[in-house]
């Protein structure tokens, strides 16, 4: 979990789980995600709501089971992933966090397809997932023991469904088709794209929304760019002269685009800082020592988020007993508070590692967001809009 302010220890009541979905993030060109990413979504009803289709609208209750390589170093090596160096951990994440991660940051769509499981299979799967999250460490191989294979193992062991027994190594973007072919997944929910979006069976990449906003901009202003990517590739200063020419609707579109531009700059900065960190660490030139020490403390302290058994000094098996949970809540809260402090320190230290040109670009986009916001409020006021 990337939010170190969130309560680290949670509970899931299997009785409140309405359905389990196969959640697929579409592929992109990065080596570690060019086959998509397989996850399972627990569709959980809010307290007091009877199990039924309406639970699908309780998006804030849904949890995602996501097998990922637990990387205890800043560098994600594709080679290490191919040879199984990374521990495989079952992360339990809020659905909203996963939607933002894929649709807004990585610009990848998500499909959430119901699995045809009976009540006993659903409840057993939830219990098995809890045990796997609690203490599982496997080896993560991008090719042969990846998220699809791990998800399939969890489905197989959790449901004991014989239709899963003879499935072997497979890629994420092929597993859904196989599950559908064996009558275990209902892909018909994706047939009507608009209805799929409305009912939470699909979460679209923000790329199409950004392009739609850019089309609004192009209708009013004679900009030369035709694709939103080209517009966002401009320097912030090159976009700025257009702002004061925009009407109310176009200004609203510009604000969303500039916020997307800021997200893009932060992603670029993240990659640049990572490369600088790795190069400086290799050269031992001392320029990243402070950030390095903080980051290592964070990595050492964050393992419990994906494997809570680390917090108990015991070699037992199964889920913790009631008295152990009291100890867990205390220790996990202390560890979480430490991570929050370290995260704040790291943010300051990493910003100092930015190249001056990148730092200027981020500052310029932040200024653009502020400028458009003020322009939008002025237009709104001039049009007689309600002032809050």
Stretches with model-predicted labels:
Residues 45-49, 120, 156-164:
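Secondary-structure boundary elements
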Residues 75-148:
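N-terminal accessory/precursor segments of enzymes
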Residues 1-2, 113, 128-388:
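Activation targets extended, charge/polar-rich intrinsically disordered C-terminal tails
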Residues 16-107, 351-358, 362:
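Glycine-rich catalytic cores of cysteine/serine-nucleophile enzymes that process amide/ester linkages
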Residues 1-14:
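Low-complexity, highly charged intrinsically disordered N-terminal segments
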């Amino acid at each position: 979990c990337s939010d170190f302010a969130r309560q680290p220890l949670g509970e899931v009541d299997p009785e409140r789980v309405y359905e389990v979905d196969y959640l697929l993030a579409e592929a992109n060109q990065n080596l570690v995600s060019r086959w998509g990413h397989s996850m399972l979504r627990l569709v959980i009803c809010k307290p007091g709501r009877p199990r039924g289709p309406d639970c699908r609208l309780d998006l804030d209750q849904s949890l995602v089971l996501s097998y990922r390589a637990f990387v205890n170093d800043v560098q994600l090596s594709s080679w290490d992933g191919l040879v199984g160096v990374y521990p495989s951990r079952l992360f339990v994440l809020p659905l909203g966090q996963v939607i933002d991660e894929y649709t807004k940051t990585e610009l990848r769509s998500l499909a959430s397809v119901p699995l045809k499981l009976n009540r006993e299979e659903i409840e057993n799967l939830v219990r098995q997932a809890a045990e796997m999250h609690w203490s599982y460490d496997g080896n993560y191989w991008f090719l042969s023991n990846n998220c699809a294979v791990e998800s399939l193992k969890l489905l197989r062991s959790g449901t004991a469904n014989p239709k899963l027994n003879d499935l072997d190594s497979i890629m994420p973007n092929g597993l859904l088709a196989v599950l559908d072919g064996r009558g275990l997944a209902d892909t018909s929910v994706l047939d009507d794209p608009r209805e799929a979006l409305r009912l939470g069976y699909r979460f679209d990449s923000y790329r199409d929304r950004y392009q739609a906003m850019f089309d609004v901009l192009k209708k009013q202003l004679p900009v030369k760019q035709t694709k939103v990517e080209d517009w966002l590739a401009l320097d912030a200063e090159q976009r700025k002269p257009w702002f004061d020419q925009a009407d109310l609707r176009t200004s609203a579109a510009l604000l969303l685009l500039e916020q997307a531009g800021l997200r893009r700059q932060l992603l670029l900065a993240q990659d640049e800082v990572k490369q600088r960190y790795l190069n400086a660490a290799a050269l031992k030139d001392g320029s990243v020592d402070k950030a390095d020490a903080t980051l290592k403390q964070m990595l050492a302290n964050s393992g419990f988020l994906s494997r809570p058994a680390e917090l108990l000094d015991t070699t037992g098996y199964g889920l913790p007993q009631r008295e152990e949970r009291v100890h867990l809540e205390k220790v996990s809260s202390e560890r979480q508070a430490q991570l929050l402090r370290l995260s704040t320190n790291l943010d300051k230290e990493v910003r100092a590692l930015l190249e001056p040109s990148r730092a200027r670009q981020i500052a310029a986009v932040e200024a653009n967001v502020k400028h458009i916001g003020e322009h939008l409020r002025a237009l709104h006021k001039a049009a007689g809009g309600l002032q809050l």
